[in-house]
Amino acid sequence: VSAQQKVNIKVWKGGKAEIIEQIDSVTFPNTMQHLICIDLGLSVKWASCNLGAETPEAYGDYYAWGEVKAKENYKWNGYKYYEPISKKITKYNTSDKKTILEASDDAATIILGNEWRIPTTAEMEELVKKCTWKWFEDEKSGYCGYWVTGPNGNRIFLPAAGCMNGNEPYAAEFYGYYWTSEVVSFESKLAVHLFF
């Protein structure tokens, strides 16, 4: 959350005011107070809802893989690590041979702090294989997705939030796409993801 306007601002601390002149922006941490860790009885804990969502059934924000901000255009020419003239990926590629997101490119880490990160492929596979998945559709509210119940009985909800296709949402209420922190290979333009 941020506020932007060039003004003087009065900051209060310990009952004393200090005027700071010509502030051009103020950024407030997005703490997502509603987000909690859910222990499903797996190797890692899982978030109670998607990034940017206030409830488990809400879609939240959409992110391009390796980008840490939601945006309006998800076309290749707007991708952070795409060079349009050569049509090549500039990071996580054959040159650097990186296949796993660095913390600086992990939306969960940047938005929520160092104790959060996007799951690895192995962690996503564990979620799929060791949990019970049950499709849920609420006709009244219109939300749908999977209740994912862990071996210990705790559960999370993964909404069928679809994905972004260019600047338009695609397949919301029908499919879910969830990133892992890994690319298929450094020779690929594809990241490993959960699809349902």
Short names for language-model regions:
Residues V1-K6:
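Bacterial Sec-dependent N-terminal signal peptides
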Residues V7-W12:
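A short beta-strand micro-motif
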Residues K13-G14, N152:
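Acidic/polar residues in short coil/turn loops that connect beta-strands
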Residues K16-F28:
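Structured surface patches comprising rigid loops and adjacent beta-strands/short helices at the edges
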Residues T27-L35:
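Short domain-boundary/entry signatures in modular proteins, especially
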Residues Q33, D39-F196:
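C-terminal, surface-exposed recognition/capping segments
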